[in-house]
């Protein structure tokens, strides 16, 4: 008992000089959370969090275009507050996944709690021992449009955002998209012009762009270099002074916004939450507004920067909750978690994931189906936004039809399957969700072209396809080729302006079908790599669409069926059969490759059979002997063609992906 009393006195002494000391204590929570001095409802560390009322809490995010220095800036802020050590040896600390580090993007939202003493910059810190300490929650969100719903939910937990812009590259397409996401969320936006140490940096030009595009006062911009540390000392004071504290009612029943979740093999589902009202304690009973299920809080704490148990979270604070959820499908992003058996109003904005791109995944080797099934099951434990249903293809066997939020989401999922689980898969042509209306007035949403039966008795009266609003920023000399590319992809121009003397901004409404494979690659090619591209979901529009089947020896290959615009059907069909002819190996029998719309064949190629010279041993003699041998060979090849199967190599499917959306 004497030891416990001494520990409590020691803990109180830590607090006396100011809450700044908590940051050091939190880096070694085991010193405070011993079995003797840690009551179930938070212990010493939990009571320290109580020193931070909402007025001394700031929740903010960092938003930027790819490679503008967002992750490096986050690292420097974590170092500046002592949350991680300088030279920690792990750049991009908050990017945990290998795919995030390789691509320089954020896929999973991460949070980090920092403690910062805000002193008067006009006076030396030694003269301000009682300067107030603030709790700062950095919520690192994905930046790509595929994850826009997750971003909107994460931004809903923030009151401000740092808008990072490269001092040399200036405003890019994703900068614009992210600004409007933050603007529509009513966040206080602090512009940060980064990389001012670069030889080509032009901060004044970037300030002018911010003024022209977003009406941001140039004097509000902070000039920094996350690499050298120049100007970083002004960032956190600006966060405290310009970003408001989180609203909330401390004396109300607990209400939390679920930001993200991931699965841990030992702890189950770990949820990142922002406490909007009340306080959450270990042992509390909570319920989900979306599912109605009830859970017991097994553990609660903050990310500092790793899981740090505190036993309690107060109003305005951001942290993690472990409550015994068995699957991330129970933890729906944007859901409201609240005190069980209490009537609370759910936080606005929750909606289920909307899948915009669908693709079939099949094992490269049919015997690996169980291994692929296990890999997808484990991966979806950490990505509940993927929809998975089993399907069977006559050409590829057993597989899965997966729905994704967008192109990048699909690409990242494939990469994680390969890197984290070693799965080798065949992907079918990506499709988007179409809506077809039949003559009798019934409507159906089609995600798999093979499911659209060519039924002559059920006439298709109308078709609708999803569209996007694409934002393209390019050097002005490439405007002509880009306009031509967008026109070829059935685009409608919405906006055409000049950002400055050298760069133009184009906005087009484009069918999602036209950009899901190679649009970005072709855009980069015709602009010598200078274009930046981003898009946001728009409405459905009526279109003239047809289903195209690929037939091998008269038999349709369901995995190769696709839906195309009627005007492009013949050209796309011609390119598909040409590609297949190059990649399908010759057999002992002739192979007919056809592209058909309904009962009409619009393109055809013939792969001739390999032929054995059956006359090699006939030296002269009666001609009827030679004819007999040739007729026998001909009959044998007919029989082989009738019962033989055509092997389609994996490379053929990869090539079809490139053709299906080519210009």
UniProtKB/Swiss-Prot annotation:
Its EC number is 3.6.5.-. It catalyses: GTP + H2O = GDP + phosphate + H(+). One of its GO terms (cellular component) is mitochondrial matrix. It is found in: Mitochondrion inner membrane. GO terms for molecular function: GTP binding; GTPase activity; mitochondrial ribosome binding. Keywords: GTP-binding, Hydrolase, Membrane, Mitochondrion, Mitochondrion inner membrane, Nucleotide-binding, Protein biosynthesis, Transit peptide. GO terms for biological process: positive regulation of translation; translation. Its main location: mitochondrion. Pfam families: EFG_C, GTP_EFTU, GTP_EFTU_D2, LepA_C. GTP binds at residues 64-71, 140-144, 194-197. InterPro entries: EF-4, EFG_III/V, EFG_V-like, EFTu-like_2, G_TR_CS, LepA_C_sf, LepA_CTD, LepA_IV. It is a peripheral membrane protein. Residues 55-247 form the tr-type G domain. Signal peptide: none annotated. Residues 1-33 form a transit peptide. Belongs to the TRAFAC class translation factor GTPase superfamily. Classic translation factor GTPase family. LepA subfamily. Promotes mitochondrial protein synthesis. May act as a fidelity factor of the translation reaction, by catalyzing a one-codon backward translocation of tRNAs on improperly translocated ribosomes. Binds to mitochondrial ribosomes in a GTP-dependent manner. NCBIfam families: lepA, small_GTP. This is Translation factor GUF1 homolog, mitochondrial. It comes from Oryza sativa subsp. japonica (Rice).
């Amino acid at each position: 008992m004497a030891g416990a009393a001494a520990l409590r006195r020691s803990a109180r002494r830590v607090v006396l000089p100011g809450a700044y000391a908590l940051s050091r204590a939190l880096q070694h929570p085991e010193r405070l959370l011993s079995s003797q001095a840690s009551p179930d409802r938070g212990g010493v560390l939990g009571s320290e969090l109580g020193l931070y009322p909402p007025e001394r809490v700031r929740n903010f995010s960092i938003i930027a275009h790819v490679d503008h220095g967002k992750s490096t800036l986050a690292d420097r802020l974590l170092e500046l507050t002592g949350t991680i050590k300088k030279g920690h040896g792990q750049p991009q600390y908050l990017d945990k996944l290998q795919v995030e580090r390789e691509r320089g993007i954020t896929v999973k939202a991460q949070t980090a709690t920092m403690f910062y003493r805000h002193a008067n910059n006009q006076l030396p810190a030694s003269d301000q021992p009682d300067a107030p300490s603030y709790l700062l929650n950095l919520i690192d969100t994905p930046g790509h449009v595929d994850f826009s719903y997750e971003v909107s939910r994460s931004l809903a937990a923030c009151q401000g955002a740092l808008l990072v812009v490269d001092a040399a590259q200036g405003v890019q397409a994703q900068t614009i998209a992210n600004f409007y996401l933050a603007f529509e969320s009513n966040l206080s936006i602090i512009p940060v012009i980064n990389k001012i140490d670069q030889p080509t940096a032009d901060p004044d030009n970037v300030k002018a762009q911010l003024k022209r595009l977003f009406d941001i006062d140039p004097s509000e911009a902070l000039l920094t270099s996350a690499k050298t540390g120049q100007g970083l000392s002004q960032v956190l004071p600006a966060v405290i002074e310009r970003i408001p504290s989180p609203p909330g009612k401390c004396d109300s029943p607990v209400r939390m916004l679920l930001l993200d979740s991931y699965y841990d093999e030992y702890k189950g589902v770990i949820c990142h939450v922002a406490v909007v009202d009340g306080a959450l304690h270990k042992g509390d009973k909570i319920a989900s507004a979306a599912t109605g299920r009830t859970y017991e809080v097994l553990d609660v704490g903050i990310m500092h920067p790793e899981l740090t148990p505190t036993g309690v979270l107060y109003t305005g604070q951001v942290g993690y909750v472990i409550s015994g959820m068995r699957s991330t499908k129970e933890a729906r992003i944007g859901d409201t978690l609240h005190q069980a058996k209490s009537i609370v109003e759910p936080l606005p904005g929750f909606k289920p994931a909307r899948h915009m791109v669908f693709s079939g995944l099949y094992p490269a080797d049919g015997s690996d189906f169980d291994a692929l099934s296990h890999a997808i099951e484990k991966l979806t434990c950490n990505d509940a936004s993927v929809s998975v249903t089993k399907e069977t293809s006559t050409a590829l066997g057993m597989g899965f039809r997966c729905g994704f939020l967008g192109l990048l989401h699909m690409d990242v999922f494939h990469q994680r399957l390969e890197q984290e689980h070693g799965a080798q898969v065949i992907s079918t042509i990506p499709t988007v969700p179409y809506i077809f209306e039949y003559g009798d007035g019934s409507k159906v949403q089609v995600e798999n072209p093979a499911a659209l039966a060519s039924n002559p008795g059920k006439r298709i009266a109308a078709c609708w396809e999803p569209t996007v609003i694409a934002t393209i920023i390019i050097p002005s000399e490439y405007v002509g080729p880009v306009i031509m590319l967008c026109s070829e992809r059935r685009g409608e121009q919405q906006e055409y302006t000049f950002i400055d003397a050298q760069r133009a901004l184009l906005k087009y409404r484009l069918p999602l079908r036209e950009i899901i494979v190679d649009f970005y690659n072709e855009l980069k090619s015709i602009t010598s790599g200078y274009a930046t591209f981003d898009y946001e979901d728009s409405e459905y529009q009526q279109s003239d669409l047809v289903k195209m089947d690929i037939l091998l020896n008269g038999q349709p290959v369901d995995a190769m069926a696709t839906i195309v615009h009627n005007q492009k059907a013949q050209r796309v069909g011609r390119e598909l059969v040409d590609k297949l002819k190059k990649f399908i190996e010759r057999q002992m029998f002739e192979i007919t490759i056809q592209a058909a719309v309904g009962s009409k064949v619009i393109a055809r190629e013939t792969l001739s059979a390999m032929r054995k010279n059956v006359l090699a041993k006939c030296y002269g003699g009666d001609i009827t002997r030679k004819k007999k041998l040739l007729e026998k060979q001909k009959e044998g090849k007919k029989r082989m063609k009738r019962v033989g199967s055509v092997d389609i190599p994996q490379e053929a499917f990869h090539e079809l992906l490139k053709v299906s959306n080519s210009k």
